[in-house]
Curated annotation (Swiss-Prot):
PROSITE patterns reported for this sequence: RIBOSOMAL_S14 (PS00527)
Subunit structure: Part of the 30S ribosomal subunit. Contacts proteins S3 and S10.
Cofactor binding comment, as recorded: Binds 1 zinc ion per subunit.
Residues reported to bind Zn(2+): C24, C27, C40, C43
UniProt cross-references to SUPFAM superfamilies, sorted A to Z: Glucocorticoid receptor-like (DNA-binding domain) (SSF57716)
Cofactor: Zn(2+)
GO molecular function: rRNA binding; structural constituent of ribosome; zinc ion binding
Pfam family, one: Ribosomal_S14
Protein known as: Small ribosomal subunit protein uS14
Gene: rpsZ
UniProt entry tagged with the keyword Ribonucleoprotein: yes
Described function: Binds 16S rRNA, required for the assembly of 30S particles and may also be responsible for determining the conformation of the 16S rRNA at the A site.
Record GO cellular component, one term: cytoplasm
Amino acid sequence: MAKKSMIAKAARKPKFSARGYTRCQICGRPHSVYKDFGICRVCLRKMANEGLIPGLKKASW
């Protein structure tokens, strides 16, 4: 889990636009965040396996 202070800091608008970055909307993780969903790979996998994201399923071939 991310620190509450870091989540609050990331929510503020940065002084320069290049300093902005995405965070997971669920857990606050700063890395490997999918822009389409707004969540990180860990939360995406968990939610996809539980069937909470419509149209997304585990690949099998």
